[in-house]
């Protein structure tokens, strides 16, 4: 029979071996062994200690009771989680929190703060274009005016867009699922309602496309991955419901880069209509390409960190990345509960305002959402606005706005907070896609507990230390992003300590506060096109993208939203875009300023020769 000393020596050996097991089960096993080791030690020393046998027995008994209560690994099976279940913690961009924001709005505006103001579309005047291409490239708010005046029908413009999709999509590759029959039925229903005097508002009968991250009942929702090409939801995302209730006509599910990154998806790369030799950037790659090509009146994109801004710039269109929490993400694929946003991608700033007026507002299915005022001002005066400009701001954009009455002031570098480590995004990625990683690991024989390299951090902890993905395994094998993007993106956050994640969130709130201080004397600012994509994404500030000149672009390589490694492309002339960043919840103001610029210029009216 083993003596307590024998047991002690064996437990010491077992505990040393268990120290290398990083799994949850391994942690439970180490805890069990630790308590057992302490109990054995107490028993050993109690038995050998002269005059202390009673105390030793007492200690062994007490610790034995402790180990009996805590020694066994938990037998409860955790509730399975998919992609959509949100954590209890919610990010709020307003430094004082939701309650303080609501009190401020009520104090300043009363009940009007929560009123939903429909966008007022100007009446159509003049001749109606007879060329289908001219109709297709009209801004969405002009198509709306024509439909309301019954100068064209929803079915007419829907058929024009469907014909253009059939013609251009084989080259541009922006459609994942074409919904032609459903679109025609929705257009006919819209025409019947309008003829009967039941006009729903400015989006009634206007055709659009939506990024294939959003659930549409009975329609495949692929997230850019062939692993999910047969995923057919039985419900509609909130944005789909709002747009349907507004009478908009859904033409197609538009491409998203694989799991919302880049412009590659399981159907290949989505291309830029201004230059089909390059991608349209991502991850809202289909919305960017389809809108620029005149194949939808407007589209809906999403962004975690650059995925609206980057494809809007790449394709030379107008777009709004709204203040965090203004549009519901319910029914959309999750990458980050604390950074994901939904916004319109359009031909003009007024189009963005018209669409956003329908999209925004609180939704009980998305706890991050709030209702705040939105009032687009078509005739805004720039004279009284506090506008900041930095040295990298596009000269053409600044000079035109100055000529319209803007008096800019110089601003310096935007606030940063050291040590944020991406704000914990990898942890959110890993949590949102744990269900998928577990499944894929089983398919290819990847041991998630054995590939971790504790000497490295973040994604790198899994980089060179994980087995190579077998050739041809997985539906993304044709995607050049897959080798780099499949596992590290969702694996890196699995090893983060809860302590580190909380510290990141504390630093993020410091960043939010610093930005609040920086913006307190500004209504908006203009900087270089990509200067603040990262910090803005973490603080929740809104920005508008707009073309400000026509020239040969110099798109940078690498980084989020850039093309996969390839020979340097030859760029061709296209609209070049700038970015206007606003204060929290001033989405209406930055779109109104962008509209003043577009009234004075025509860069947003240019069309790709290919289309």
Descriptions of predicted regions:
Residues 20-40:
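N-terminal secretory signal peptides and thylakoid transit peptides that target proteins
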Residues 121-126, 318-398, 462, 466-469, ...:
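A short helix-breaking turn/cap at a secondary-structure junction
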Residues 150, 205, 245, 249-251, ...:
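Glycine-rich, small-residue loops and helix-cap segments
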Residues 36-37, 41, 54, 59-222, ...:
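Short, well-ordered alpha-helical
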């Amino acid at each position: 029979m083993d003596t307590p000393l024998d047991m002690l020596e064996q437990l010491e050996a077992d505990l040393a071996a268990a120290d290398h097991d990083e799994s949850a089960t391994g942690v439970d096993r180490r805890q069990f062994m630790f308590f057992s080791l302490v109990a054995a030690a107490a028993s050993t020393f109690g038995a050998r200690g002269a005059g202390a046998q009673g105390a030793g027995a007492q200690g062994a008994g007490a610790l034995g009771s402790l180990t009996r209560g805590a020694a066994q690994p938990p037998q409860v099976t955790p509730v399975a989680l998919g992609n959509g279940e949100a954590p209890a913690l919610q990010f709020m961009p307003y430094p004082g929190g939701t309650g303080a924001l609501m009190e401020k709005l009520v104090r300043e505006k009363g009940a009007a703060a929560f009123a939903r103001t429909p966008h007022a579309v100007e009446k159509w005047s003049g001749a109606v274009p007879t060329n289908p291409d001219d109709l297709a490239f009209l801004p969405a708010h002009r198509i709306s005016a024509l439909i309301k005046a019954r100068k064209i029908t929803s079915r007419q413009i829907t058929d024009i867009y469907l014909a253009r999709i059939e013609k251009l999509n084989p080259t541009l590759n922006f459609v994942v699922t074409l919904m032609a029959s459903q679109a025609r039925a929705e257009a006919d229903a819209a025409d019947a309602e309008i003829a009967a005097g039941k006009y729903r508002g400015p989006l009634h009968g206007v055709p659009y496309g939506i990024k294939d991250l959003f659930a549409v009942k009975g329609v495949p929702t692929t997230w850019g991955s062939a692993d999910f090409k047969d995923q057919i939801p039985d419900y509609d995302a909130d944005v789909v419901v709002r747009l349907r209730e507004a009478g908009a006509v859904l033409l197609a599910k538009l491409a998203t880069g694989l799991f919302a990154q880049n412009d590659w998806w399981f159907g290949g790369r989505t291309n830029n209509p201004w230059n089909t030799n390059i991608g349209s950037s991502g991850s809202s790659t289909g919305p960017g390409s389809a809108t620029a090509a005149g194949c939808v009146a407007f589209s809906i994109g999403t962004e975690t960190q650059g995925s609206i801004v980057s494809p809007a710039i790449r394709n030379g269109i107008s777009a709004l990345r709204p203040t965090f929490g203004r549009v519901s993400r319910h029914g959309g694929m999750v990458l980050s509960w604390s950074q994901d946003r939904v916004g319109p991608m359009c031909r003009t700033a007024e189009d963005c305002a018209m669409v956003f007026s329908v999209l925004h507002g609180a939704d009980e299915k998305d706890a991050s959402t709030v209702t705040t005022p939105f009032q687009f001002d078509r005739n805004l005066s720039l004279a009284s606005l506090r506008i900041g400009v930095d040295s990298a701001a596009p000269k053409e954009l600044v000079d035109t706005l100055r000529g319209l009455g803007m008096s800019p002031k110089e601003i310096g570098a935007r606030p940063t907070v050291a040590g944020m480590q991406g704000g914990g995004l990898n942890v959110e990625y890993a949590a949102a896609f744990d269900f998928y990683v577990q499944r894929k690991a089983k398919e290819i024989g990847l041991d998630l507990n054995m590939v971790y390299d504790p000497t490295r951090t973040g994604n790198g902890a899994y980089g060179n230390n994980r087995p190579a993905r077998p050739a041809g395994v997985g539906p993304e094998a044709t995607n050049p992003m897959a080798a780099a993007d499949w596992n590290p993106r969702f694996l890196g956050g699995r090893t983060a300590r809860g302590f580190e994640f909380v510290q990141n969130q504390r630093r993020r709130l410091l960043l939010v506060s610093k930005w609040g201080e920086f913006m307190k004397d500004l209504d908006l600012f203009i900087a270089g096109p990509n200067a603040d994509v990262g910090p803005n994404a973490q603080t929740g500030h809104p920005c508008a993208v707009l073309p400000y000149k026509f020239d040969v672009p110099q798109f940078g390589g690498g980084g989020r939203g850039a093309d996969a490694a390839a020979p340097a492309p030859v760029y061709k002339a296209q609209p070049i875009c700038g970015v206007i960043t606003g204060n929290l919840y001033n989405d209406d103001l930055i779109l109104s300023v962008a509209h003043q610029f577009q009234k004075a210029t025509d860069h947003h009216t240019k069309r790709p020769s290919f289309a």
